[in-house]
From Swiss-Prot:
A Pfam family per the record: Pribosyltran
InterPro entries attached to this UniProt entry: Ade_phspho_trans, PRibTrfase_dom, PRTase-like, UPRTase/APRTase
Protein family membership: Belongs to the purine/pyrimidine phosphoribosyltransferase family.
Catalytic activity: AMP + diphosphate = 5-phospho-alpha-D-ribose 1-diphosphate + adenine
Protein's UniProt name: Adenine phosphoribosyltransferase
Metabolic or biological pathway, per its Swiss-Prot or TrEMBL entry: Purine metabolism; AMP biosynthesis via salvage pathway; AMP from adenine: step 1/1
Keyword rRNA-binding: no
Subcellular location: Cytoplasm
Gene Ontology cellular-component terms listed: cytoplasm
Species of the source: Mycolicibacterium paratuberculosis (strain ATCC BAA-968 / K-10)
SUPFAM superfamilies the record matches: PRTase-like (SSF53271)
HAMAP family: Aden_phosphoribosyltr
Length: 180
């Protein structure tokens, strides 16, 4: 099912190639492993094509560390735009723009380079593999907005609807290719 609640060929393809891993990374979590989906050329083409339709009009695509990089780069290529890697804290040399956010147990940081890239006025779509609670995507949107960028939407391959990630991102439009 998509974010519109409809079964599509892309949603069915995602469902058929998503590996369910129980109790990972901790007990009670049902991890969605999209590696088989990304490794299948036809599926990757279908997924990036669908995400590119949601990202049209952007002049930059931002992917979140790390699986978001895989999809964002392919979407940017389709749209003939650049791609920006939003990194986990401590992975980039200074200076950086950073945004801290809370996790279930602790906190984390996202970073982008502070030099060499002018994001003021850029229309950016943020891409990631999975939307769960929305904390990471919300932090990415705040980070980009602080640099003067206009975040136009977020797009994900897989949404865990019961975790309420859309609410954390409101009023930002969120597009998911499949929702469970």
């Amino acid at each position: 099912m998509t974010d519109a609640g409809e079964a599509t060929p892309v949603a069915e393809l995602i469902a058929s190639l998503t590996r369910q891993v129980p109790d990972f990374p901790k007990p009670g979590i049902q991890f969605k492993d999209l590696t088989p989906l990304f490794a299948e050329a036809t599926a990757m083409t279908a997924v990036t094509g669908a995400l590119a339709r949601h990202a049209s009009g952007a002049d930059l695509v931002a992917g979140i560390d790390s699986r978001g990089f895989l999809v964002a780069a392919a979407v940017a290529d389709r749209l003939h735009t650049g791609v920006l890697a939003i990194r986990k804290g401590g992975k980039l040399p200074p200076p950086v723009h950073a945004e801290r956010y809370d996790l279930e147990y602790g906190s984390a940081t996202l970073e982008i380079p502070a030099d060499g890239i002018d994001l003021r006025g850029r229309r950016i779509v943020i891409i990631d593999d999975v939307l769960a609670t929305g904390g990471t995507l919300a932090a990415a949107a705040r980070l980009l907005r602080r640099t003067g960028a206009t975040v136009t939407a977020a797009a994900v391959v897989f949404e865990l609807g019961a975790l309420g990630g859309r609410a954390a991102l409101a009023p930002l439009p969120v597009h998911s290719l499949t929702c469970q």
